[in-house]
């Protein structure tokens, strides 16, 4: 039987050595990106399910998948952060909100999330009509909705519209309000929802303070599809859904804190006023703070880092962004628990073009990781992740995890509404936090790039764009995880720690790619093709 050590001994035989070590590859000093190299295959003697992706993103914060969603206002709010944590990663809530309390509220939604619970269900109000329910069904696919006094979560629950109330109600093709939608009971689009709904006194209810097991038992005993969750005042707090409860069995890798709540991060800028924001999100239960700045080596970053470590020493802090070892040393010396690496490498970032400052992401990750890892500080590679293979490459260069923006934009869980773009393509808006759109939305985005709100001339370091619909993260994230596992299996490593050790020891070999090699490695020589990834 062939043993892995037999294969490794062949690799160490100079006459049979292919490629070069990572240190040899990076010794040429030219700026390398992820696309400039490949990793050579190793020996496989284990299954893909045996590959562990557990990693640390700070000294004390561990996650089960090396995936972090970027704190951008078109990428991460509570919906994205919840999904990221369910699949073993972590989401970082962006800071481009009108008020600090709004960001804290998003953190709370993540921390209060319970398996099967919908914390922000679409509600109808007392003044809603049958037409409004039909629109919710058409737009979101929901077959029922709670009815509250003013149509919001937190308002008094007065009833529930279920699929049974709408089973025989249909719209005409045009969806005109004057067209009858039922031949029975004289129900029309203008029929008040209060006439159709099941009133609250006829509903089975759960209480917000009940243990999840108790509410789930009530749902099962009464064979309910949905169970409204209320507080002592009868105000709607959440909706427990049978379909979502069944999905809960599919998250064995979920990232939890010591209290059994999902992990969640938040981004804060370097302005002095942001100390109030820090206090609010920490109060909400945030697990890690990211100090959000395009250039992390500044007096402003150091001041914010010191404030957080002095006022909230239990909270982990990822500082950045940095791309050099000198920058890394500065922030580690000031108490950073993790570092965020990248400057100008994101798909919507134009910093390198406009400011003439930045660094190729592959080289930045390698150089900073070599120094930071010696000091026990994990790094998160931020930017330049185009596909699943780039995640594996970032890890090979020393990253503990990758941060994704464009890769997650236009998923169902990303903030914003879909719309139809040119050619009938379903798209969502995606913008860099250094774009004029983001800066005009709120001042906190300007602070990331050291731009004052009063400045009449603003220099954009990002663009606004649209991204094609990627579908739900419930399909996309598992694809990314399994893709990384397959890549590591091909390399012959069982874990990220094993990967890092074999890279450092020169067992894992690399090869730089010529321009033609890059073309050859992609789809080519075809008349037409369809690229379906998952």
From Swiss-Prot:
This is Inosine-5'-monophosphate dehydrogenase. Homotetramer. Coiled coil: none annotated. Mycophenolic acid (MPA) is a non-competitive inhibitor that prevents formation of the closed enzyme conformation by binding to the same site as the amobile flap. In contrast, mizoribine monophosphate (MZP) is a competitive inhibitor that induces the closed conformation. MPA is a potent inhibitor of mammalian IMPDHs but a poor inhibitor of the bacterial enzymes. MZP is a more potent inhibitor of bacterial IMPDH. Its cofactor is K(+). One of its GO terms (molecular function) is IMP dehydrogenase activity. It holds the Pfam family IMPDH. SMART domains: CBS (SM00116), IMPDH (SM01240). Keywords: CBS domain, Cytoplasm, GMP biosynthesis, Metal-binding, NAD, Oxidoreductase, Potassium, Purine biosynthesis, Repeat. NAD(+) binds at residues 292-294, 342-344. It comes from the Eukaryota.
């Amino acid at each position: 039987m062939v043993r892995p050590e037999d294969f490794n001994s062949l690799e160490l035989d100079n006459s049979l050595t292919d490629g070069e070590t990572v240190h040899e590859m990076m010794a040429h000093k030219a700026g390398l990106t992820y696309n400039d190299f490949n990793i050579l295959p190793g020996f496989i003697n284990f299954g893909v399910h045996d590959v562990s992706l557990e990693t640390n993103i700070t000294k004390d914060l561990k996650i089960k998948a090396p995936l972090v969603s970027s704190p951008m206002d078109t990428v991460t709010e509570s919906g994205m952060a919840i999904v990221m944590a369910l699949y073993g990663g972590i989401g970082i809530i962006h800071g481009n909100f009108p008020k600090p309390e709004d960001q804290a509220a998003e953190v709370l939604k993540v921390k209060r999330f319970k398996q099967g619970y919908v914390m922000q269900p679409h509600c109808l109000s007392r003044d809603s009509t049958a037409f409004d329910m039909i629109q919710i069904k058409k737009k979101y696919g929901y077959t029922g909705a709670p009815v509250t006094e003013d149509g919001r979560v937190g308002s008094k629950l007065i009833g529930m519209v279920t699929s049974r109330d709408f089973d025989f109600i249909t719209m005409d093709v045009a969806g005109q309000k004057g067209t009858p939608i039922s031949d029975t009971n004289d129900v029309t689009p203008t029929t008040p929802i209060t006439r159709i709904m099941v009133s609250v006194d006829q509903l089975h209810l759960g209480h917000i303070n009940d243990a999840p097991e108790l509410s789930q038992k009530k749902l099962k005993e009464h064979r309910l599809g949905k169970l409204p969750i209320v507080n002592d005042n009868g105000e709607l707090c959440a909706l427990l859904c049978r379909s979502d409860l069944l999905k809960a069995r599919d998250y064995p890798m979920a990232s939890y804190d010591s209290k059994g709540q999902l992990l969640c991060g938040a981004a804060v800028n370097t302005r002095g006023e942001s100390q109030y924001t820090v206090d609010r999100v920490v109060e909400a239960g945030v697990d890690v703070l990211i100090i959000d700045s395009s250039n992390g080596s500044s007096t402003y970053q150091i001041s914010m880092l010191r404030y957080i470590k002095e006022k909230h020493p239990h909270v982990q802090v990822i500082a950045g962004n940095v791309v050099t070892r000198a920058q890394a040393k500065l922030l580690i010396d000031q108490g950073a628990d993790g570092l965020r690496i990248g400057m100008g490498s994101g798909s919507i970032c134009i910093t390198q073009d406009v400011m003439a400052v930045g660094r190729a992401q592959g080289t930045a990750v390698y150089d900073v990781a070599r120094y930071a890892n010696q000091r026990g500080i994990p790094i998160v590679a931020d930017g330049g992740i185009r596909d699943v293979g780039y995640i594996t490459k970032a890890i090979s260069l020393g990253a503990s995890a990758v941060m994704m923006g464009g890769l997650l934009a236009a998923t169902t869980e990303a903030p914003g509404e879909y719309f139809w773009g040119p050619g009938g393509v379903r798209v969502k808006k995606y913008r860099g936090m250094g774009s004029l759109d983001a800066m005009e939305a709120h001042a906190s985005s300007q602070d990331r790039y050291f731009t004052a709100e009063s400045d009449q001339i603003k220099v954009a370091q990002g663009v606004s764009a649209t991204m094609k619909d990627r579908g739900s993260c419930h399909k996309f994230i598992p694809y990314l995880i399994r893709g990384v596992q397959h890549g590591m299996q091909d390399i012959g490593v069982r874990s990220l720690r094993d990967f890092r050790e074999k890279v450092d020891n020169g067992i894992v070999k690399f090869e730089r790619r010529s321009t033609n090699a890059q073309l050859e490695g992609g789809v080519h020589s075809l008349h037409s093709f369809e690229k379906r990834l998952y």
